């Protein structure tokens, strides 16, 4: 149905979208998202996180109860895993007492840094465990996942969902994952191994992986909307009127865009602790950057030993926090680019309606109002990642983060030298 004749390439129909979805890259991207989601879901079910069950019939997640006996066994195993190195905790407490009463100068500095890092690890681990088990967080996650499924389904039905996985983001994430795996393997065989530190890294990565997949889904939603508007503009550039079925699509498009923004605000407000935890890794990063500088520039070890000690000890804790922040910053920059492109396309669409549709028609007035509210909403509540204290995590922040790490680590090295500390030998920890 149309107010004018159809051209052979008139509209990007559902059939065309289904053909497009069978292309190898679309199949690959679709399987990546589905595979990642099922892996995260399977881990949650296996370890009794969240107590949510996916209902394939309704395409929604629902609260469920696990088997009572098996659930109790899993809880006992979790407690044992956390409490197993009790002797090491006792030694750690004794060491803290001795350092507080006896240690001074650069050794006191190193001890204080270690204590700060350990305190942050324990605090973040506590929040991670609460997030994975608390009923309030379960409700938040249930709402978020159901919104993601609903928006994806709506885009699929009305516009044709095009999945897009940013290759640069994925490469950076996989590089971080590889470095983290090497670091965890090294940590596992350390004589001072503590299961709480190991769990901190593993659970933080599990939660961040889910957040990263969510960010990629956001970018896919924007890509789908942008693609639809581009084809709308191409289709009507040389037409005298606008096809009727497009009227019924543009209003739901604005509604979905508003729903996407509200969802991201909801997610950002409820998992702000996760981005804060990522930022607080800066202490781990600084402390290990100091060790890396001392070992690479001042230690008298052989080059082969230096490389091994750096790789085995401090390289991972330096690189992983920076890569976490870099990923969040890159996502924010891509959100900004997508929103700018979306604004430009909406301006062009509104211009087409002003020229090709009578201005007193209801659709033209509604479209103008929706466009105005969208621009205001994007200005007041842009789609972005906040890191700490409502600071936006973008490329500028990432650069500030890296510079802060380097300058602070150099200051700590300078203080160690000025107090006569020993830096002539490589160490992986102090």
UniProtKB/Swiss-Prot annotation:
Listed name of the protein: Gustatory receptor-like 43a
Membrane-crossing segments per the record: 32-52, 80-100, 111-131, 169-189, 278-298, 307-327, 397-417
Glycosylation sites per record: 422
GO cellular component: membrane; plasma membrane
Segments on the Extracellular side according to the record's topology features: 53-79, 132-168, 299-306, 418-430
Keywords annotated in UniProt: Cell membrane, Glycoprotein, Membrane, Transmembrane, Transmembrane helix
Cytoplasmic topological intervals: 1-31, 101-110, 190-277, 328-396
Membrane topology, as annotated: Multi-pass membrane protein
The keyword Glycoprotein is assigned to this record: yes
Domain of life per record: Eukaryota
GO molecular function: ligand-gated channel activity
BP terms from Gene Ontology: transmembrane transport
Subcellular location, record wording: Cell membrane
Additional remark text: Gustatory receptor-like proteins are divergent proteins which do not belong to the canonical gustatory receptor or olfactory receptor families but display some structural similarity. They are predicted to be ligand-gated seven transmembrane domain ion channels.
């Amino acid at each position: 149905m149309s107010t004018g004749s159809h051209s052979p390439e008139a509209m990007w129909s559902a059939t065309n979208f289904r053909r497009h979805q069978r292309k190898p890259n679309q199949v690959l991207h679709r399987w990546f998202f589905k595979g990642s989601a099922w892996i995260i879901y399977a881990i949650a079910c296996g370890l009794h996180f969240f107590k949510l069950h996916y209902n394939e019939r309704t395409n929604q997640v629902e609260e469920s109860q696990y088997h009572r006996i098996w659930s109790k066994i899993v809880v006992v195993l979790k407690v044992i895993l956390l409490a197993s190195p009790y002797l090491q905790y006792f030694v750690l407490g004794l060491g803290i007492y001795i350092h507080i009463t006896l240690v001074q100068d650069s050794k006191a500095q190193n001890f204080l840094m270690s204590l700060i890092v350990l305190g942050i690890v324990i605090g973040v681990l506590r929040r991670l465990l609460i997030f994975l088990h608390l009923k309030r967080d379960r409700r938040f996650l249930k709402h978020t996942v159901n919104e993601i499924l609903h928006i994806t389904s709506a885009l699929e039905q009305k516009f044709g969902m095009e999945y897009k996985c940013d290759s640069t983001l994925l490469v950076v994430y996989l590089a971080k994952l590889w470095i983290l795996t090497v670091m965890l393997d090294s940590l596992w065989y350390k004589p001072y191994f503590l299961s709480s530190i190991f769990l901190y890294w593993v659970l933080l990565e599990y939660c961040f992986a889910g957040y990263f997949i969510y960010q990629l889904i956001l970018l896919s939603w924007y890509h789908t909307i942008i693609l639809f508007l581009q084809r709308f503009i191409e289709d009507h550039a040389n037409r005298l009127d606008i096809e009727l079925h497009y009227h019924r699509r543009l209003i739901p498009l604005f509604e979905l865009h508003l729903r996407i923004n509200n969802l991201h605000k909801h997610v950002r407000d409820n998992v702000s602790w996760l981005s804060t935890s990522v930022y607080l890794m800066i202490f781990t990063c600084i402390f290990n950057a100091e060790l890396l500088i001392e070992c690479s520039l001042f230690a008298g070890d052989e080059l082969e030993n230096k490389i091994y000690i750096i790789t085995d000890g401090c390289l991972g804790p330096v690189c992983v926090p920076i890569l976490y922040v870099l990923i969040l910053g890159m996502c924010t920059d891509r959100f900004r680019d997508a929103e700018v492109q979306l604004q430009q396309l909406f301006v062009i669409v509104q211009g087409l309606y002003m020229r090709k549709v009578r201005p007193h028609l209801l659709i033209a007035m509604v479209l103008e109002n929706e466009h105005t509210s969208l621009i205001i909403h994007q200005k007041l509540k842009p789609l972005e990642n906040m890191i700490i204290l409502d600071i936006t995590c973008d490329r500028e922040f990432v650069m500030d983060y890296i510079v802060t790490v380097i300058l602070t680590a150099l200051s700590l090295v300078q203080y160690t030298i000025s107090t006569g500390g020993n830096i002539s030998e490589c160490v992986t920890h102090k």
